[in-house]
Structures are given as C-alpha cells and as structure tokens.
C-alpha cells in the first residue's frame, strides 16, 4: 500500500477546504504537513486544518511512512484517554469534538450567571492578594506579594496547595502555614485525629509508590532530554507542580512546562 500517496491525498483534501477556521462549521485541528521533528516549521505553508479523525489518521500514516520514534510518540499522546483507555481514530474524533462543543456551551452558560462573574472577580483579586508565611509553631517568617510569588520561591511546592492552605482547606503546604493576614504568632496547626492520620498515611503510601517511578522528559518534537528517578525530581527541575506533570503523563494535557512527560 502506498501510504505516502494516501497521506498526500489527505493533506490535499484539507488544503482544499482552506485554513480559515471561521469559515468552517465543524471542529478542526492544526496539523504540520512536514512534522516538526523532521524539520517542519510553523510557517502557514506547512499547516493544514484537519478533522480530529483525519489528524489521527495523518499521524498514523506518517509513522507508517517514516517509522521514526518521535512520530510514534506523537501517536501515543493522541490515542490514549486520561484513564489509559486506547482510542481509535473515530472515537478520538468524537471525543475531541464533543469536548470542544461542551466546553464552549458550558462557558457561555457560566458567564451568564452573575454569581459566577462575582466569583471570578474575587478570584482575580485574591490572585494578587498578599499572603503571609509561618513556621509550624506559628511564628511569622515573611510576606509574599501573592500566591504565585510564594510558589515560585518554594520550587518544591505548588500554588494550588498554598491556595488550599490560606482558604482553610488544609493545615500546611510545603512544611509551612499560610494566611492572608499578619500576626506575630498564629499558633500551631490544630491536631488531626488518629483516624485522619491513618487515612493520610495509607494515601501517602500509594502516592509514594507512583512518585518513585522514573519519569522521562521529552521536548515537543519527541526528543528524549532527561530521565528523572521520580516525579518530584522532575517537578523541581522545572520549578513546577507534580500534579501538572502527572496530568501530562496521564494524557489530560499534552505538555507541562514546555515539555512532554511519560513514565516510559
């Protein structure tokens, strides 16, 4: 079978439709005709709009033609759902189109609600609100301009954890207490019950096993850059959150901090 001929016909079909998304009434994705891992650029002449099914098929054809590991990685990123279920091109297309449409409609409804507008307005204000760092004995350490600054300073921590702490949803984050207000001493965090401690211990054991699995870091072309002994080391290297890297590994996002991540 002449895979190159089939690929060229598929690309020609997409080019004949045009590359103006505003003129198309259905969901499409941008595809690099010559893959970036093979020297392709982001120039408009190297781009074509394809349906999700066509996009998936195009990557399969490229791999069948050239048999490059980097092309295989691109397919791997496309053909697995977040729970590890393998998808064929029809299922992939249906899911991508359905999700895109669903998100678009839900966001339209979201912004119609005055309570949601108020919530987002408050969230934006809190994002730039000063926060105060305390040790576990309640002693004041320092003030940060906002949660983002605190998270960047503590490369092993995460802004989400700090946000949960200042909102009262958790006691500590990164080995510290965090508040929206200043005090010389806020006291020690309240003690947890034995039942809660046991529950957290069981949860941490499971998390630790997953975190000790080697993590592979790739650039966006599929080139292997580094191998980290565990996910925590990977997060520290990019001054990011383990949760964002895990989302990339599980397929919930394609990249995290400018890289592709995988367990193998």
From Swiss-Prot:
InterPro entries: HNH, HNH_nuc, Intron_nuc_1_rpt, NUMOD1, WH-like_DNA-bd_sf. Pfam families: HNH, NUMOD1. One of its GO terms (molecular function) is nucleic acid binding. It comes from the Viruses. Residues 25-50 form the HNH domain. Keywords: Endonuclease, Hydrolase, Nuclease. The keyword Magnesium does not apply. To phage T4 mobC and mobD. This is Probable mobile endonuclease B. It comes from Enterobacteria phage T4. The gene is mobB.
